[in-house]
């Protein structure tokens, strides 16, 4: 049996976003949080086939479009990447919104705005359209907050590190320069991957954060290594790690949200403040704290992220059960 998937490929500030516009598995008409559980249980082979080699690669990410059960949303989305099926993905949302509008997949109820149901909740996206193309997008992300301060772990190759745990749609370990880590300068991509893997393993022993409003969202699977900006167009720089060995090419939407929540929790950003976050390749997301929020009684923020994406092609992908590598593979 051969299954086909119609995909539209894009990138958000350098990070790939593969939008599955046709062929995704049929799921019950329930919330996206419930659909995510069903997808992971029964259909994770789709994620692996579309994200892993030979059809994808180590940093591939994407989204599958679904109808929403919410009357206040235009559509719904599941976010998939090499590491799993995520509650939320900021870069993925920016790419998804750009594809949905430029390719005519969705007709928004309100021109200039899309409302999307995600497993993490409803997110709104404002977009600027010029000559039929989406020039810029601003994502209004889910409520974000600082979960834990100064979690001390021993990381082989560095020694003792103090990290914060923050939520921006996914839980992040937030690392700032300190005695045993001087910053991103001089770190290779291989260094970031190796140290992130060790950090995540060490954190898993001492810290297992759970979202206060949804216990299905738990655990630190992402890290953001933060440093001073590399250009005058940014306020900070970060390397986002996820999966087994992936480094986000964009500044990271949920990562930038988590970083702003951490800075807010430490009193270094306030309501209405902006934070321009630079990626390793020099692209920038403009974050802004739109308002305050309570997340299970914990003070947090309502972040927005400004960025852009570009459509790069159409792709009909076949998954043939006769193929011994039909469901993809990874080299670890």
Swiss-Prot record:
Protein name: 4-hydroxyproline 2-epimerase 2
UniProt function note: Catalyzes the epimerization of trans-4-hydroxy-L-proline (t4LHyp) to cis-4-hydroxy-D-proline (c4DHyp). Is likely involved in a degradation pathway that converts t4LHyp to alpha-ketoglutarate. Displays no proline racemase activity.
UniProt family annotation: Belongs to the proline racemase family.
Keywords: Isomerase
Recorded catalytic activity of this chain's protein: trans-4-hydroxy-L-proline = cis-4-hydroxy-D-proline
Cleavable signal peptide: none
Source organism per UniProt: Rhizobium rhizogenes (strain K84 / ATCC BAA-868)
Active site: 89
SUPFAM superfamilies assigned to the protein according to its UniProt record, in alphabetical order: Diaminopimelate epimerase-like
EC number: 5.1.1.8
Gene Ontology molecular function: 4-hydroxyproline epimerase activity; trans-L-3-hydroxyproline dehydratase activity
Binding site for substrate: 222, 248, 253-254
Isomerase is among the record's keywords: yes
Source organism, top-level taxon: Bacteria
